Curated annotation (Swiss-Prot):
Coiled-coil blocks: none
Purpose: Binds directly to 23S ribosomal RNA and is necessary for the in vitro assembly process of the 50S ribosomal subunit. It is not involved in the protein synthesizing functions of that subunit.
GO molecular function, one term: structural constituent of ribosome
UniProt protein name: Large ribosomal subunit protein bL20
Family affiliation: Belongs to the bacterial ribosomal protein bL20 family.
Length: 117
């Protein structure tokens, strides 16, 4: 009986990894042993940074809201506290969008919260 070496299976696995490694520098795009390490590390970075992206965007929204609120004489933390007391349920993403693109709408929200500070 002949020896089965899983030729087709391993070739497909190698092809899959090398396809993911396309565009890498040096031997990482052509040598399977190097490519598999680089692809695994890249997937780890992608997994980590998908979570970090949420953190980064929240920070960006807070910075934008803080800058817009300071033009009206408030601080971010006071403004968010006043929003909660006024029972205005708008998330930070929408507030930042209003602050950047619709300053009149944002100003009206700030006016509604002034009574609750």
């Amino acid at each position: 009986m002949t020896r089965a070496k899983s030729g087709k299976i391993s070739k497909n696995r190698h092809k899959k990894i090398l396809k993911l490694a396309k565009g890498y520098r040096g031997r990482a795009n052509s040598c399977f042993r190097v490519a598999i390490e680089k692809v695994e590390k890249a997937l780890q970075y992608a997994y980590r940074d998908r979570r970090n992206r949420k953190r980064d965007f929240r920070g960006l929204w807070i910075q934008r809201i803080n800058a817009a609120v300071r033009e009206h004489g408030f601080v971010y933390s006071q403004f968010i506290g006043a929003l909660k007391k006024a029972e205005i349920d708008i998330d930070r993403k929408v507030l930042a969008e209003l602050a950047v693109n619709n300053s009149d709408g944002f100003a009206s929200i700030v006016e509604k919260t002034k009574a609750h500070i």
